[in-house]
Each structure stands twice: as C-alpha cells, then as structure tokens.
Amino acid sequence: MNCTALVLLLAVTAAAPDTLVICPSEFRSALAPWEEYRRRQGHEIVILPPLDRPEQLQATIAHVAQSGTLKHLVLIGDVPNAAAMYAAQRQLTVPTHYRPANINTRWGSEPTIATDMPYADLDSDGTPDLAVGRIPADNPHELAAVVRKILRYERAPPRNSDRRLNVVSGAGGFGALTDMIVEAAARQVMRQTVPKDFEVRRISANPTSPDSPPPGQLRPYICRQLSASGFAWIYLGHGRPTELDRVPAATGREPMLSVDDVPGLRCTAPCPLAVLVACYTGAFDADRDCLAEELVVAENGPIAAVAATRVTMPYGNTVLGYELLRACFHDRPATLGDVLRLAQSRTLASAADDPMRPSLDGLARGISPPPVDLAAERREHVAMYHLLGDPLLRLRYVAEEVADASIQADEETVTVK
C-alpha cells in the first residue's frame, strides 16, 4: 500500500461513511459531479485509490467497515486483464476475485468464476453485507458519460414508461422438454412478481411465436426496443462476452445484439436498466470489454446492467431472476444496489416459506445434470452475476396509488387518478 493510500485509510477511522468508493486518481475529476450530488443527498463518502491485489482491497474494505455504518461499495474501473499489462493501464483498474467453480463447469464453463462478491461479504459467511456496483470505465471520458446518465436518470420527471418492462426471449436449445419447462417457469415468475399495472412488451427469437418480429427484423426490433425508455430491458437466452445468441439471418447467422450495435443505441431518458439473464455477457475480465460493459459506459446506453461473468444455468438463472423481481417490486429498496443485495441473500437461502421457490426446486431436480446440488448452483450464480453501474442509483418507482399526480407521458403529460 502506498503512503497516500495509508494516510487516507487512517483518516477514515475518524469518519462514519455509508459509502466507500474505490477510484483511480485519474478518474477523480470525472467523478466529481457524482460525488457532489450524492453528498447533497446525505451520503457520507470516502474515496480511496485501488490496490494491486484483491486481498489487499478486501482488507481495506474491512477496515473502513469497522465504523459499522458502511452500506455501499462503488468500484470505479475495469478489471485488469492480459491487455492491461502495462503499469499505466493497470493503475486505472480495480482487481476482482477468482473463486473455484464446481457446478457450471459441467456446462463447459471455466474452472474459476470472476467475482466481486467477496468484497460485499464482511463477515465471511457467504452472504453479502454491502451493496456493490462496478462502473467499468476505461478512461475519464467513459466515466463522465456514466455520471451524466445517472444525473439525468434521477432528475427526470416520472413518465408512463416507468411502468414498462421490455422482455426479449432467445431460443432455449436445452432440449424440447427442458425449454418448455424453463419458459413456463419464467412466465410464472413474471406473473407472480410484476405489478398488474405494468406493461410488458415482448420480443421472441422463436419464429413461431406471436411475439416474433417479421423475418430479418429481429435485430433492428431489439435495438429499437432497447433504445425506448422503460423501467427495465430484460434478455432471457444464450450469450457470449460480446454478443447475445446468434439466430438465422439472410447472411447466415447473426447475433441478436452485439457490441457493434451499442454506438447506434439512443436510449431515451430515463434510460432503462438492462438485465441480461445469459452466459458471459458480464465477463468483465475478458480480453476486450464485454457487452454489458459497453452498454453501461455508452452515453446513450442503459443506465446500468446486471449480467454474469461465466456460464449460467437454467435453475440458478430462474431463482436469481425471481428474487430480483420480488425484491424490486415487492420490497422496493430505494437503491439498485440494495435490490441486488437482497436478491442475492434470498437466492442463497433455502426459502422454504416462499411458495414459488419449492416449485422451482422441484423442476430443477428434473433438468439439472447429476449430481444435483441446488444450493451450490445458487451460490455460483450469486458469485457470477454483478451490477455494472452505480449501486446508489435511486430507482424510478411509481407509487401504486397516485392521487392527482402529473406523470409525463412519452410525448405528453397525463393526469393519473
């Protein structure tokens, strides 16, 4: 640890921060508007430079948490990889942990999972104590773009689109029976959790589905849907680090969405949250920026993304997805980071008192590869899914009962009774 970092760390002892930010010094000026805005909201913030090894950083977080007030951890910077071999590049990054994988390796995943989860676990019990988010900026320009999006998002007036979910379903490919079971479970989860006053707009990659766009129009439809305002944009399907699943097209097979499409996105304020329930789309340790990273740092991309760093599995995806929706729409924590933290904690628990979870467990025993270890599968999915974005982001909830409140429509203002 360098002398500057040591002095700053010792100074924390006298403070009682609720938010710790790990930020390279080169990014501080780009972060300044965010810091000022959050402090005006009442947050006590400590900002420290990154360290070379995750174990060192974890010890620093534990020291700051001794105040007993720490709730949020914001990591500013990408994960170092082979491309960041030079010291000047590595000092702009924040390291991550690598934990052994035992379950998803049966589906072809790597032997380790890239994960920021240990930073959230202050008492080493395997459950997150902090709400953690990583803003994967490679340079001050990208961080400034993210900060501008955050400020626009939180300052925008309520809109009709705040009650809209846009959902894209890819092809299953696990076998006809498993695909049918997974699709039925996903629809049941949506019915049980999404408020009835929400509009759910669907696009399907299955050409026989009534939600399928005209032939050859799937990719443009998805880009337009993602560019539209809404509470969240959710993708359910296969993925790779830089793209979603590939589907038949006039020129062969092309991705439903890729990093090449990101510059053309025009997400209208307030930008939606992107939830990518898929393999690899959040692989922030890959040699190049993954799809979720590109979406988040783009000026006109989604406000944040929840995505996985490794191969995901149907059961783990379904449980974590269910708990995300339940936390968001039933518990309604104020911030995005606390939505994910609550969902992670519930995913790790057996939740026998919840009527949906035993049903999902029963279905999983019929489709998961033997030997079945549902608890271990849930742990791995909690480890690999991350929030790429600001954990302090205040979500745009619309009150279920709004009296004489003016809500802005997409093109006009309407009065909600």
Regions found by a protein language model. Name each.
Residues 15-417:
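Cysteine-dependent hydrolase recognition
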Residues 2-13:
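Sec-dependent N-terminal signal peptides
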